[in-house]
């Protein structure tokens, strides 16, 4: 028994295949999905989706969206997604360091659109870096 996983972004079908287990980065924490899971709809945070299939793990960086689980089918609709195996680890690390520097430079300043955008960029850079490092 296995799951069918589909990860869809507006510009591409990121993943469409079978999975033994899926770990989703929901807005309330990591959510593990196995065959036979109850139906649910959840918000997806910026983070890394992990897929166990064929004895190995794959990672996908997600940039927020929604996931639906129904009858062993997991459908993830996201704003943007990237397979961990296609992300250059050195570039992802450099982007993370750059985003960290920007956020650190804004610390202590009042809330502003610039500060929110910088934090979003940091979260996205972190997800890409983690997905690149955990790709098999």
From Swiss-Prot:
It is a peripheral membrane protein. Pfam families: ATP-synt_DE_N. GO terms for cellular component: plasma membrane-derived thylakoid membrane; proton-transporting ATP synthase complex. CDD domains: F1-ATPase_delta. GO terms for molecular function: ATP binding; proton-transporting ATP synthase activity, rotational mechanism. It comes from the Bacteria. SUPFAM superfamilies: Epsilon subunit of F1F0-ATP synthase N-terminal domain. Keywords: ATP synthesis, CF(1), Hydrogen ion transport, Ion transport, Membrane, Thylakoid, Transport. It is found in: Cellular thylakoid membrane. The keyword Thylakoid applies. Produces ATP from ADP in the presence of a proton gradient across the membrane. F-type ATPases have 2 components, CF(1) - the catalytic core - and CF(0) - the membrane proton channel. CF(1) has five subunits: alpha(3), beta(3), gamma(1), delta(1), epsilon(1). CF(0) has three main subunits: a, b and c. Belongs to the ATPase epsilon chain family. This is ATP synthase epsilon chain. It comes from Parasynechococcus marenigrum (strain WH8102). The gene is atpC.
């Amino acid at each position: 028994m296995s799951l069918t996983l589909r990860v869809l972004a507006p510009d591409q079908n990121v993943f469409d295949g079978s999975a033994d287990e899926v770990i989703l980065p929901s807005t309330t924490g990591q959510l593990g999905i196995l065959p036979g899971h109850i139906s649910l709809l959840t918000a997806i945070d910026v983070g890394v989706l992990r897929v166990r299939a064929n004895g190995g793990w794959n990672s996908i960086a997600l940039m927020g969206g929604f996931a639906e689980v129904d009858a062993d089918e997991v459908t993830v609709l996201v704003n943007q997604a990237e397979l961990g195996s296609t992300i250059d680890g050195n570039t992802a690390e450099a982007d993370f360091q750059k985003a960290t520097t920007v956020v650190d430079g804004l610390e202590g300043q009042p809330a502003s659109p610039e500060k929110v955008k910088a934090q979003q960029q940091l979260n996205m850079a972190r997800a890409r870096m983690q997905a690149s490092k955990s790709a098999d």
